[in-house]
Swiss-Prot record:
CDD domains in the cross-refs: IGPS
Signal sequence region: none
NCBIfam families reported in the protein's UniProt record: PRK00278.1-2, PRK00278.1-6, PRK00278.2-4
HAMAP family found in the cross-reference section: IGPS_B (MF_00134_B)
Name the UniProt record assigns to this protein: Indole-3-glycerol phosphate synthase
Catalytic activities: 1-(2-carboxyphenylamino)-1-deoxy-D-ribulose 5-phosphate + H(+) = (1S,2R)-1-C-(indol-3-yl)glycerol 3-phosphate + CO2 + H2O
Family: Belongs to the TrpC family.
Entry superkingdom: Bacteria
EC number: 4.1.1.48
Organism field: Xylella fastidiosa (strain M12)
Length: 264
């Protein structure tokens, strides 16, 4: 496990303990009973692909540990609207406070501003966070294989699916992929960023693509910065993408999305 991931997870344990002092898990469970049905995250991606278009999960991210602040003028609702107009199929919203300058409210603001399904992009390690994601309005959660043991993967993915959410399971290498396909989550995200070196290579997706079962939807994540990157992955049969940094640095994120994915 990388040094930065170890630090993030240690902080996440502290954060969950702090949140439990204010809102109990039982209270979150009770709130989940009265919520509207989630928007279909995996279904939205599949529908776009069936139509013949690339399925884009557009990320709303203020900052990252490696790059610092990506966007000073950060307005989640406006960014969400821009992404929807630009052709995104789904959104991903960073809610981690300490390392990514995210906030739970960013997810709610983005989701309320558009009709797209939303992924809560955070470091989920405990059932408390799954219930919390559902209460916030998330339609999908992220599970990072490098951060979890097999029992956690089974339990957390099962709980999310039981609550009506989809699950994006993120892997970085073949060993993690073999673990990911043992659970029934519909989405497999291949992160092109090496967690140890933070180097990025699209070869990670291209090398591992053939090992993803046909009944799972592969999502390529990180390092997709240009239309040439998109064309390279599309030519190899990759149809779903998670992109954040390239859009966050653009004056108009949705227009940047449209230019990268839909103008040839």
């Amino acid at each position: 496990m990388s040094n930065i991931l170890t630090k993030i997870l240690a902080r996440k344990v502290e954060e969950i303990a702090e949140r439990l002092l204010h809102v109990s898990q039982a209270e979150l469970v009770a709130r989940c009973a009265d919520l509207p049905t989630p928007r279909g995250f995996a279904a939205a991606l599949q529908a776009t692909i069936v139509h013949g278009d690339p399925a884009v999960i557009a990320e709303i991210k203020k900052a990252s540990p490696s790059k610092g602040v990506l966007r000073e003028d950060f307005r989640p609702a406006e960014i969400a609207i821009s992404y929807e107009l630009g052709g995104a199929s789904c959104l991903s919203v960073l809610t981690d406070v300490h390392f990514f300058k995210g906030h739970d409210n960013y997810l709610s603001q983005a989701r309320d501003a558009c009709t797209l399904p939303v992924l809560r992009k955070d470091f989920t390690i405990d059932p408390y966070q799954v219930y919390e994601a559902r209460v916030l309005g998330a339609d999908c959660i992220l599970l990072i294989v490098a951060a979890l043991d097999d029992a956690q993967l089974v339990d957390l993915s099962g709980l999310a699916l039981q609550l009506g959410m989809d699950v994006l399971v993120e892997v970085h290498d073949i060993d993690e992929l073999e673990r990911a396909i043992q659970i029934s989550a519909p989405l497999i995200g291949i992160n092109n960023r090496n967690l140890s070196t933070f180097n990025v290579s699209l070869e990670t997706t291209l090398t591992m693509k053939g090992l993803v079962p046909r009944d799972r939807l592969l999502v390529s994540e990180s390092g997709i910065l240009t239309s040439a990157d998109v064309q390279r992955l599309r030519a190899a049969g990759v149809n779903a993408f998670l992109v954040g940094e390239a859009f966050m640095r653009a004056a108009e994120p949705g227009e940047s999305l449209r230019e990268m994915f839909f103008i040839t």
